[in-house]
């Protein structure tokens, strides 16, 4: 669908674009569209992520690695030692959040165990997460906590745990990421990482307007990194 929307924007002769990449950890399929916008001197700004080989383009992003580090460090400081992780494999946010997970484990003297990590794709998130939770908690060495890619996954994990007669947070601690409305609507009070969505949008809009007013907009790549907090 990204190619369809990019074509629509191209046909409408827009003056600038804010783009949230899809499957950003994979090689981009629509480089020809981005090149076409550049040839037309139309600036674009990536938000939330970027594509491989396009790291030099203007972008506004959250420090996903730092955010997940904070979540896992929080669990470790609460005495959790068997911390599972669930991450999305086909976007750059998932890859960087996994890096933060690994770094926090190491920082707290906890060995990384790949058997405690569940990976999912956009298309199979519920299937993979359900299977992963059942496998993790069906073993004799159950995790004492789960750090999730985002709040949506965390709420799904809580549902699966409840179906297995495991209470959150009494039996298992679960953390999310995004501080979305789902965090407050979860059965358990979900600890989550605040995602500054409004700030991201403001910075992206300001950046694209500044680029529109420049003489050479596509020659001026820059990045704005927004911090997170528990």
Task: List the predicted regions and their residue ranges.
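Hydrophobic alpha-helical segments within soluble ligand-binding/sensing domains
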Residues: 58-85, 99, 103, 126-135, ...
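An alpha-beta-alpha
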Residues: 69-110, 220-230
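Short acidic capping loops at alpha-helix termini that bridge into adjacent secondary structure
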Residues: 82, 112-116, 168-173
């Amino acid at each position: 669908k990204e190619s369809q929307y990019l074509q629509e924007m191209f046909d409408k002769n827009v003056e600038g674009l804010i783009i949230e990449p899809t499957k950003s950890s994979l090689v981009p399929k629509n480089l020809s569209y981005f090149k076409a916008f550049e040839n037309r001197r139309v600036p674009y700004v990536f938000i939330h992520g970027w594509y491989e080989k396009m790291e030099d383009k203007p972008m506004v992003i959250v420090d996903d690695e730092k955010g997940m580090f904070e979540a896992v460090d929080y669990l470790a400081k609460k005495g959790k030692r068997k911390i599972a992780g669930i991450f999305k494999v086909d976007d750059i946010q998932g890859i960087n959040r996994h890096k933060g997970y690994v770094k926090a484990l190491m920082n707290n003297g906890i060995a990384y165990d790949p058997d405690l990590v569940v990976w999912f794709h956009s298309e199979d998130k519920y299937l993979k997460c359900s299977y992963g939770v059942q496998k993790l908690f069906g073993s004799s060495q159950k995790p004492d906590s789960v750090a999730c890619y985002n709040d949506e996954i965390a709420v799904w994990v809580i549902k699966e745990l409840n179906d297995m007669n495991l209470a959150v947070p009494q039996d298992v601690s679960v953390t999310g990421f995004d501080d979305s409305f789902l965090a407050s609507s979860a059965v358990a009070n979900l600890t989550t990482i605040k995602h500054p969505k409004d700030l991201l949008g403001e910075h992206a809009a300001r950046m694209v307007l500044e680029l529109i007013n420049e003489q050479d907009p596509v020659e001026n790549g820059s990045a704005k990194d927004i911090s997170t907090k528990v």
